[in-house]
Each structure stands twice: as structure tokens, then as C-alpha cells.
Amino acid sequence: MRESNTLSGGIFALLNRAIGSVLLALIGFYRTWLSPLLGPHCRFIPSCSAYGLEAIQRHGPWRGGWLTLRRLSRCHPFTPCGCDPVPD
């Protein structure tokens, strides 16, 4: 029974790494190709893409992705700007 738990844990860890890599690649694509075309318009420090990179690297793809989505939902003209670091 223990071998199956180890195997499922290994698969889950591999899946987490794969999803994290895809999310980081998407942010990298945005920063390299789309952001120069759109210009800087983020209301926060750090920028939303830098926030996303740090959140995913620090908290993993699930919580980091959720934090990034919440941050993106707050980045609009009706929200006050300012410093919004990734939480611990």
C-alpha cells in the first residue's frame, strides 16, 4: 500500500511541476511578446507579471496561480494603485 502512495505522490509532484512550468512560460511569453506591444500600464508595484512569477515560484502553481488571478482582477482603473507584494 505504501508503494502506491509514493507513486501517487510522485505523480502529483510531477503534475505540479508541469503546471508551474506552463504558467511560468505563459507569463514569460506575455512579458517578451505582448507587454512591449501593450506598453506599461500596471497600477501596482511589483507589476502583475512580476507578481505572478514570484507567487508561482514561492507558493506553487495552485496557490500562486490563484493569487495571480486575484491580483489581475484588482488591476483596473477603479482600484487605487500602490505597493502590493506577494503574501507569505
Swiss-Prot record:
Keyword Hydrolase: no
Stored InterPro entries: Membr_insert_effic_factor_YidD
Localization terms from the record: Cell inner membrane
UniProt keyword annotation of Membrane present: yes
Keywords: Cell inner membrane, Cell membrane, Membrane
Membrane topology: Peripheral membrane protein
GO cellular component term of the entry, any: plasma membrane
Family designation: Belongs to the UPF0161 family.
Function: Could be involved in insertion of integral membrane proteins into the membrane.
Entries under NCBIfam families matching the protein: membrane protein insertion efficiency factor YidD
Protein name in the entry: Putative membrane protein insertion efficiency factor
